A protein has these predicted regions:
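Histidine-acidic metal/acid-base catalytic patches
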Residues: 1-27, 52, 95-97, 133, ...
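Glycine-rich, proline-tolerant flexible connector loops at the mouths of alpha/beta enzymes
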Residues: 32-53, 103-110
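Active-site-proximal loop/turn and secondary-structure-junction residues that shape catalytic pockets
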Residues: 10-12, 35-37, 64-67, 103-107, ...
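Metal-dependent catalytic neighborhoods of phosphoester/phosphodiester hydrolases
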Residues: 41-46, 77, 250-253
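Conserved beta-strand positions in the central sheet of alpha/beta enzyme cores
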Residues: 32, 60-62, 100, 147, ...
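Active-site acidic/histidine proton-transfer and metal-coordination neighborhood
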Residues: 53-54, 70, 74-178
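N-terminal substrate-binding region of glycoside hydrolase catalytic domains
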Residues: 22-42, 62-66
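N-terminal small/glycine-rich loop or linker at the start of catalytic domains
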Residues: 1-7, 59-70, 105-116
Length: 266
């Protein structure tokens, strides 16, 4: 059975220990952390160390910032790189496996006016390769992995599909950079989500889950047996990290996910 995790902001409780107690009772195997900007994640290091000592399982952190390593502005790119390197260091210090980030989020979409970004595709590619190389080398030095997450076309204009992420990662050529897949974005961008998982099996390092409408798994129409079956086929051994909006009673919505995924083939 595939392991499950819930992002920390979705879990009830005022401490990671309290959130972990709920998570375990609901059937989760881990908590995915959120990494805010301004080195906020590094400032939590003692809190995270105490939680780890108390048995909280925290394998991954997902970036939670307003700008990313593919930003148009050079200063924002530099800051995003520094923030991500710090998050990789912290997740390594608490025994985790890696950190997930998109190239950008909400910066530009080719599906919305003005339709043409201020930077060429060639310039985008050069900036992404430079950033991924720097982050990948830092991740390798820390013994963890950077997960590049493709986002849908309305949230990012650079990396939307797994094949685009795979091309960048193969060009970088570092084992410390892998794809972080997300079921919601794949439902929008991939003609056959299960097939594309099989096609890029060797590069998939992390997985986040929400349904076709961004609500919790079970609230939409995603073909979960096919998607989960593909992960089983490739021997995926990471977590399915819940990253979603919640519909209905939020506590019950979060509680429902592990059992739903199990019924669906996890």
């Amino acid at each position: 059975m595939l392991k499950t995790a819930a992002q920390e902001q979705l879990l009830p409780g005022d401490t990671l220990q309290a959130k972990w107690e709920f998570a375990q009772q609901a059937g989760y195997d881990a908590i995915e952390l959120r990494g805010k900007g301004e080195l906020h994640f590094a400032a939590r290091l003692e809190e995270l160390r105490r939680a780890r000592k108390d048995g909280v399982v925290m394998p991954t952190v997902c970036v939670d910032m307003l700008h990313f390593f593919g930003a148009f502005d050079a200063d924002r790119r530099r800051d995003a790189l520094d923030q991500m390197k710090s998050q990789l260091t912290v997740i390594a210090e608490i025994g985790g496996v890696g950190a997930q980030t998109p190239a950008s989020y909400g910066m530009f979409s080719r599906r919305l006016p003005p339709f043409e970004p201020p930077r060429s595709e060639e310039e985008d590619r050069e900036i992404l390769l430079t950033g991924l190389t720097e982050l990948g080398e830092h991740a390798r030095a820390e013994g963890v992995t950077l997960f590049l997450e493709p986002l849908n076309r309305y949230e990012d204009h650079m990396v939307n599909r797994l094949e685009q992420a795979a091309d960048l990662i193969r060009t970088v050529g570092l084992d410390s950079v892998r794809i972080g897949i997300d079921s919601y974005h794949m439902n929008i961008e991939e003609a056959d989500p299960a097939a594309v998982i099989l096609a890029h099996a060797e590069l998939i390092g992390h997985a986040q889950v929400s349904d076709s409408n961004r609500f919790q798994p079970g609230a939409g129409h995603l073909d979960w047996p096919a998607w989960l079956g593909a992960l089983h086929t490739i021997g995926y051994d990471g977590h399915l990290a819940l990253e979603c909006r919640l519909t209905g009673d939020p506590v019950e919505a979060v509680r429902s996910v592990p059992a739903f995924l199990k019924r669906s083939g996890a």
